[in-house]
Amino acid sequence: MIPRKRYGSKNTDQGVYLGLSKTQVLSPATAINSSSDIAPLPTPVALVPSPPDTMSCRDRTQEFLSACKSLQSRQNGIQTNKPALHATRQCSEFTLMARRIGKDLSNTFAKLEKLTILAKRKSLFDDKAVEIEELTYIIKQDINSLNKQIAQLQDFVRAKGSQSGRHLQTHSNTIVVSLQSKLASMSNDFKSVLEVRTENLKQQRNRREQFSRAPVSALPLAPNNLGGGPIVLGGESRASRDVAIDMMDPRTSQQLQLIDEQDSYIQSRADTMQNIESTIVELGSIFQQLAHMVKEQEETIQRIDENVLGAQLDVEAAHSEILKYFQSVTSNRWLMVKIFLILIVFFIIFVVFLA
């Protein structure tokens, strides 16, 4: 059998592949010897094994820890901001309540001005009694409602006083006292208007009684109405007496009608005066409630006044101490001499050693 001669790394003989197998690996020495003897042939791309897919790893533990810390700090910040948000919400509720009370006070003041204009009229023929009574009733109801609202506002401030700061509580108490003073001033004005109305009613009644006519009992009746007639004609006399009552003198009937009108007018005026008196009594009770509320605020105001006085004394003491220190510094001549000597020494050192 004739041996076959190898001419290279691969040879074909009768369709047989004699080159390297896909799994065969050459050693470095063999590869060098073979490369020195035989020119290397380009390796087919399809035969080169693809490198294995490797995933690059990176330690991101610190990033995870920093993200956890940032999230925890955000949650802590939200928790710390919750009291501030709660205080802001309480402040907004208090502001809305105070604004509503102030608006109601302004509306009631406008009604009171209108009532004042109507109550100061002294004419008998331009007396709008119905409108005055309606305004009086409305203003009285408004004052009662405002008194209740201010009491609720004070209770709200008292309930939330422990949760809010000292300055916020002081501000709230100041607003409550201001609203109470405005309500007291308006109630006092309303009371004075009612007193003016009462005086005008008394003057109108006196004027009306002065210019009214005499009552019917003082006027003589017609003799026909009181005359008797014969005893025999008793029935006819009674009939004529009945007819005489029906057929009165026109002047007497007008006087009776005028008396009825006067009675109704006097009764209406008496009712009006009773309403005014009851309103004044209710205003007195409102004044007592306001006085009690102001008395409760008196301790807070006194405490604020004492704190202001203490702060003023501290400021004055600090100012006096600063003046003393300034005088001691300005009068200390040795300090100026020492500073001058130090500057001279530094100048000499700089000129002699550094120049």
Curated annotation (Swiss-Prot):
Q: Name one Pfam family in it.
A: SNARE
Q: Which InterPro entries match?
A: SNARE (IPR010989), Syntaxin (IPR045242), Syntaxin-5_N (IPR021538), Syntaxin/epimorphin_CS (IPR006012), T_SNARE_dom (IPR000727)
Record keywords: Coiled coil, Golgi apparatus, Membrane, Transmembrane, Transmembrane helix, Transport
PROSITE patterns listed in its UniProt record: SYNTAXIN (PS00914), T_SNARE (PS50192)
Q: Under the GO molecular function aspect, what terms does this record hold?
A: SNAP receptor activity; SNARE binding
**Major localization listed first in the record, in broad terms:** endoplasmic reticulum
| Keyword Membrane belongs to the record | yes
Q: Which residues form the t-SNARE coiled-coil homology domain?
A: 263-325
Looking up SMART domains in the UniProt record yields: t_SNARE
Classification via Gene3D superfamilies: 1.20.58.70
Report which superkingdom the organism of origin falls in.
Eukaryota
Q: Which cellular component appears as one GO term in the record?
A: Golgi membrane
Q: Which residues lie on this side of the membrane: Vesicular?
A: 355
Report the coiled-coil segments.
287-318
Per the record, the similarity remark reads: Belongs to the syntaxin family.
Q: How does it assemble?
A: Part of a ternary complex containing STX5A, NSFL1C and VCP. Part of a unique SNARE complex composed of the Golgi SNAREs GOSR1, GOSR2 and YKT6. This complex also includes VTI1A. Component of a SNARE complex consisting of STX5, YKT6, GOSR1 and BET1L. Interacts with BET1L. Interacts with BET1. Interacts with COG4. Interacts with GM130/GOLGA2. Interacts (via IxM motif) with SEC24C and SEC24D; mediates STX5 packaging into COPII-coated vesicles. Interacts with VLDLR; this interaction mediates VLDLR translocation from the endoplasmic reticulum to the plasma membrane.
Query: Per its record, how is this protein called by name?
Result: Syntaxin-5
What's the name of its gene? Stx5
